[in-house]
Amino acid sequence: MMENLLIPPPPWVGRVDGTSSHHLRWHQAVTPLHDGAEPGACVLIGFSSDEGVERNKGRRGAARGPDALRGALSSMALAEPLRVYDAGTVAVTDNRLEAGQMALGSVVAATLDAGQFPVVLGGGHEVAYGTYLGLAQAAVRTPKRRIGILNLDAHFDLRSDPVPSSGTPFRQILEQEHASGTALQYSVLGISQPSNTTALFDTARGYDVRYLLDDDCSVSDRHRVAVFVSEFLSDVDLVYLTIDLDVLPAAVAPGVSAPAAYGVPAETIQFVCDAVAASGKLAVCDVAELNPSFDIDNRTARTAARLIHRIVTKRIPIAV
């Protein structure tokens, strides 16, 4: 029997300029998820964990990420009314990461099966395996639909560690897909060469991972980035978009476990998110590695919230 690790959502509060549709902000649109929530709505799911980060020898603090993201989203203005629910937060306690990932997968799958759009608020990048489990279990995934994972990240996260961590999720996913005899395309945009060993590049080649280095993702490289994303989208039917905030420059995203010495400009990341949201293929999204303990002026949380805002408000639903 699946253990229930879901805790209720916190209250959403923020600035109030009025109650008409012309004054709406996120906190006025979000309500707790209930059984009658309509298909097509966005459902926020928190994943409070930094167990995977610690196992990967990183800095603790990402467990506070979900509520920091909620806080940054709260007062963002909505151009038009939004259907959005908060399912609460899957909390990883007592080092029980694997149980938390399974619980998250169950919530994501239920959300997808209800015809809704899950957006998972991490948490370390160990969130990815839980998000994937949900998509893999959901009815929306059929044998004829190929899953594509687009990871915006400075790291491959393909480590072969003895226990699951924030550095292993995509290797776990690829191994599970291989064992099941199913096809999955894993692509990464923003890879930092100095942050990934030759062994990790070799592993990526072995799994036929497509990637674009951070050196090739500047604002002047827009065409190269557009081609990379377009080719990815053309080869898949369902997209899981995962954003590790350490893909951004440290000046923009200081509040992560491993701040980037170089990073991909926010303009490029926003462009990619917009393209994926408008593709009509985006099934699920998560945001990982926000560490409020190291954030400065909430820069990282605000940047992440802007990306979430654009993804949710610009997303074209998947055709049934």
Curated annotation (Swiss-Prot):
Xref: PROSITE patterns: ARGINASE_1 (PS01053), ARGINASE_2 (PS51409)
Binding site for Mn(2+) 1: 125, 153, 157, 244
One Gene Ontology MF term: manganese ion binding
Metabolic or biological pathway: Amino-acid degradation; L-histidine degradation into L-glutamate; L-glutamate from N-formimidoyl-L-glutamate (hydrolase route): step 1/1
Cofactor note: Binds 2 manganese ions per subunit.
Cofactor needs: Mn(2+)
EC number: 3.5.3.8
GO biological process, one term: L-histidine catabolic process to glutamate and formamide
Enzyme superclass (EC): hydrolase
Catalytic activity: N-formimidoyl-L-glutamate + H2O = formamide + L-glutamate
InterPro entries with a match to the protein in the record: HutG, Ureohydrolase, Ureohydrolase_dom_sf, Ureohydrolase_Mn_BS
Domain of life: Bacteria
Keywords: Histidine metabolism, Hydrolase, Manganese, Metal-binding
Binding site for Mn(2+) 2: 153, 155, 244, 246
Primary role: Catalyzes the conversion of N-formimidoyl-L-glutamate to L-glutamate and formamide.
Entry similarity comment: Belongs to the arginase family.
NCBIfam families: hutG
Protein name, entry field: Formimidoylglutamase
The encoding gene: hutG
